[in-house]
Amino acid sequence: MITYTKPLSKLIGHFEKFPGIGPRTAQRLALFVLKQPESTIRDFSKALLEAHSNVGRCKKCFNFTSEDECEICKNTERNQKLICVVAETKDLLALERAREFKGVYHVIGGLISPMDSVGPELLEIRSLVERVSKSEIDEIILALTPSVEGDTTSLYIGKLLAPFTKVTRIAYGLPMGSELEYVDEVTLARALEGRTKLN
């Protein structure tokens, strides 16, 4: 077992908390940081603190923004009557890269997962229902990960929104359990085109 000096060990431990970062990658990142000039580290620290202090959630869709509403919600050229529901902002970004979707989004902040003690009350589902019930929405597209949790969440939301509008789910050309974030743009574009009706 490798023994690090305490400050380095602490830094590696912090990097390991990042999603997708294992012990070896955390070690590489920590060693990279130590090689940087102090001015670079100060700038990086400042950028982290500024982002954490100044970036919040859009009051409409819960995407990240530094204003009350995000750029997508404020864009009058987007179809405000077409809402795509995603679990996380990273999924929204993946769909934006595909350049196929012209509507707006609603970020629910995760998936229903009883095993992880995540119920619907911990997600932005109630705000979605309120948003749909108070507006004229033509269609809700559910773009949630093809997994047990994704299916559960889609069915739950589909039942809640069925009285208000048409609810569809994007088609998938990828295996069960795949993360939306890692799907290529062409597959995502086809998934949007081939969406199926839920209600």
From Swiss-Prot:
UniProt-recorded Gene Ontology molecular function terms: DNA binding; zinc ion binding
Domain Toprim: 81-175
Superkingdom of the organism of origin: Bacteria
C4-type zinc finger span: 58-73
BP GO terms, sorted: DNA recombination; DNA repair
Protein keywords: DNA damage, DNA recombination, DNA repair, Metal-binding, Zinc, Zinc-finger
Entry annotated with the keyword DNA repair: yes
SMART domains reported for this sequence: TOPRIM (SM00493)
UniProt xrefs under PROSITE patterns: RECR, TOPRIM
CDD domains: TOPRIM_recR (cd01025)
Pfam families tied to this protein: RecR_C (PF21175), RecR_HhH (PF21176), RecR_ZnF (PF02132), Toprim_4 (PF13662)
Entry-linked InterPro entries: DNA_Rcmb_RecR, Rcmb_RecR, Rcmb_RecR_Znf, TOPRIM_dom, TOPRIM_RecR
Family note: Belongs to the RecR family.
Function: May play a role in DNA repair. It seems to be involved in an RecBC-independent recombinational process of DNA repair. It may act with RecF and RecO.
UniProt protein name: Recombination protein RecR
Protein's gene: recR
